[in-house]
A protein has these predicted regions:
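Charged, amphipathic alpha-helical oligomerization/scaffolding segments
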Residues: 74, 244, 248-251, 312, ...
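Substrate-recognition/cap regions that form aromatic- and gly/pro-loop-enriched pockets
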Residues: 325-408
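Structural signal for terminal/edge beta-strands and the immediately following C-terminal loop/tail
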Residues: 4-19, 431-451
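Glycine- and acidic
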Residues: 58-67, 112-115, 149-150, 234-235, ...
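C-terminal amphipathic alpha-helical interaction region
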Residues: 397-448
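Sequence-structural signature of the catalytic-core scaffold of metal-dependent phosphohydrolases
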Residues: 2-30, 42-53, 62, 73, ...
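Acidic, low-complexity proline/glycine-rich segments
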Residues: 36-48, 344-350
Length: 451
């Protein structure tokens, strides 16, 4: 068994910026470097586009439910609480951390939460699958002999997590070195699967494309994140500890908020929803929650669900903080296994699993969700077929027309085939659902500007 030097908080919390490692610019306000990360993301175009990307249900109609933007904002809120509470607990255990950057981990986690879904293509996981399948099952399969094995592994496992790291760090045309020029700690905290596509998990998850591998290695070395792979093996690292808090915030929000949305859309009855949410608590606490709802004069069922949901999120946040603090040594040693949710106490853990089971059975397989997945898959499949072929054969007349639609920030005019293919994937994965549908209709002659 290989022995690794444990990670340490002083090294893990770094405000050094990618691409500006040697620069210390004069500051004209009191914002911390991590708050700058947060603000930079809030005002960015990729973050803004999340408002038009599906979370689970079709984009809001008359009943407003979550999209990727509202989800990311909620995850950032929970993530900030998780980080602040962990900082409070661990500084009591390690008083020497009080005079370091460690008290700011709530801001780091919050910024990383904002960025965690930036790389998701239109239509979520069905969009991911369509990009992968174009190369494994579609006309793109013939490209395998024309590209490197590392690049082929990346595109056949295309992953939103790796794409988020690329968006934040890659030097697109006309951009500065370092991409968004984020701090090392924020960047490391979004890499949920810190390994290359060649070392992808059974679910096909990985954290960075080959094009950004050197950047992640630079960050990991600086922060003392141990490399778990041996020389010659596919690259694999331990997680930065704050990844567990980002993951927990996401786990809490998507599971519990999907239950609330399902009630609003009448997929779940009020009785079903209340039962799912109240089972997180013992009988005495349930009765206190129900009595508080009565005492507050809450009679609307949607408002009752909101109150119960808030209680559940508060409980899960407390439980995840406890799990992190309890397992701090394993986390710093890179030996912690599973997510924080899997290490909370039995009652809320079983209740969370029950919510997951209901989500799979009644929500993710509901007709509105499946309709979006089917349509989204077809749209992305068609865009991949047309646009990647244009990248492969750029001199054809129709290819030039299609290439003319691509944003100038992407390296679509590169002499290198892999760069052109990746430019098209960048373009497609950055689309909103509505824009992807619009381009799909236009290139297929379904809609015309003059009609």
């Amino acid at each position: 068994m290989r022995i690794f030097v444990p990670m340490n908080w002083q090294q893990l919390i770094s405000n050094k910026r990618l691409g500006q490692e040697e620069r210390h610019a004069e500051r004209h306000d009191d914002r911390s470097e991590f708050k700058r990360d947060y603000d930079r993301l809030i005002f960015s175009a990729p973050f803004r586009r999340l408002q038009n990307k599906t979370q689970v249900f079709p984009l809001p109609g008359s009943i407003f439910v979550h999209n990727r933007l509202t989800h990311s904002l909620e995850v950032a809120s929970v993530g900030r609480s998780l980080g602040d509470d962990v900082a409070h607990e661990l500084m009591r255990r390690h008083p020497e951390l009080c005079d370091t950057l460690f008290p700011q981990i709530g801001t780091i986690v919050s910024a990383a939460c904002l960025a965690h879904d930036l790389g998701n293509p239109p239509f979520g996981h069905s969009g991911e699958k369509a990009i992968q399948a174009y190369f494994t099952e579609g006309d793109g399969a013939g490209l395998q002999e024309k590209v490197s094995s590392a690049f082929w592994s990346d595109i056949t496992h295309f992953e939103g997590n790796a794409n988020a790291f690329r968006i934040l760090t890659h030097r697109f045309k006309g951009r500065r070195d370092g991409g968004f020029v984020m701090t090392y700690s924020t960047l490391a905290s979004i890499v949920k699967y810190p390994y290359s596509s060649a070392a992808a998990s059974k679910k096909g998850k990985f954290g960075f494309f080959t094009t950004e591998q050197d950047l992640y290695q630079r960050i990991a070395r600086e922060m003392g994140i141990p490399c778990l792979s041996k020389p010659g093996e596919p690259l694999r690292y331990a997680r930065h500890p704050l990844v567990y808090l980002v993951e927990a915030a996401d786990d809490i929000c998507y599971e519990i908020m999907d239950i609330e949305d399902s009630h609003k859309l009448k997929i779940l009855t009020f009785e079903e929803t209340a039962e799912l949410l109240l089972q997180f608590f013992d009988e005495a606490t349930r009765q206190r929650i129900l009595q508080r709802i009565v005492d507050e004069g809450i009679t609307d069922n949607n408002e009752k669900v909101i109150y119960m949901r808030a209680s559940v999120i508060g409980l899960l946040e407390h439980e995840c903080v406890g799990a992190f603090v309890e397992h701090e040594d394993e986390i710093l040693n890179g030996t912690f296994e599973g997510s924080l949710i899997q290490h909370i106490s039995e009652r809320p853990r079983k209740a969370y699993s029950a919510c997951t089971a209901v989500s799979v059975r009644k929500i993710y397989n509901s007709k509105p969700v499946l309709d979006v997945e089917l349509s989204g898959y077809k749209i992305i499949e068609t865009l991949m077929d047309s646009l990647v072929q244009a990248a492969v054969y750029p001199d054809k007349f129709h290819s030039r027309q299609l290439i003319g639609r691509v944003s100038s920030q992407y390296h679509i005019d590169s002499p290198d085939l892999e760069t052109r293919i990746m430019a098209m994937i960048d373009y497609i994965s950055g689309m909103t659902d509505v824009y992807a549908l619009d381009i799909y209709q236009k290139i297929n002659g379904i809609s015309l500007p003059i009609v």
